[in-house]
Design a protein with these regions (language model features):
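N-terminal secretory-pathway/extracellular module detecting exported/lumenal segments
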Residues: 16-129
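Sec-dependent N-terminal signal peptides
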Residues: 4-13
Length: 129
């Protein structure tokens, strides 16, 4: 139990608790997407950065309802692709409120299409113009 509590504290302290969220617009169905460029960390061609999905209406995951999700993303700057590392589901908007659930299963790399919000996030993470 102490290990779970410690890992949760570490994730939250490494995450965007007092983030400087930059809006990237709406992504259909009332979801606003934000990123915090101050959380970027680079390792070669790969960059990690926190992204926030803020919902106008409650979303369901299993039996919990949440209004925002903070995602720790990894971007490949050599190729336009990304993968999710961790997602934290939060009860309130803009990442505020109680943490309801957390998932950190390794995901697969997903290609990024030009002209999408994902492409804009990739450009921010990788310092592309």
């Amino acid at each position: 139990m102490k290990r779970l509590l410690l890992s949760t504290v570490l994730v939250l302290s490494a995450g965007p608790a007092s983030a400087e969220w930059m809006s990237f617009g709406e992504s259909g169905a009332g979801t606003t997407v934000y990123a915090d460029p101050t959380t970027k960390s680079r390792d070669g061609d790969q960059v990690n950065m926190w992204v926030l999905f803020d919902f106008k209406t409650a979303q369901a995951k299993a039996d919990v309802l949440y209004l925002s999700a903070k995602a720790h993303m990894k971007y490949d700057c050599a190729k336009p692709r990304y993968e999710g590392l961790t997602v934290i589901y939060v009860s309130g908007n803009m990442g505020n409120g109680n943490i309801l659930d957390r998932s950190s299963a390794k995901s697969m790399w997903l290609r990024i299409s030009p002209g999408t919000l994902d492409h804009d996030l990739w450009k921010l993470a990788c310092d592309k113009r």
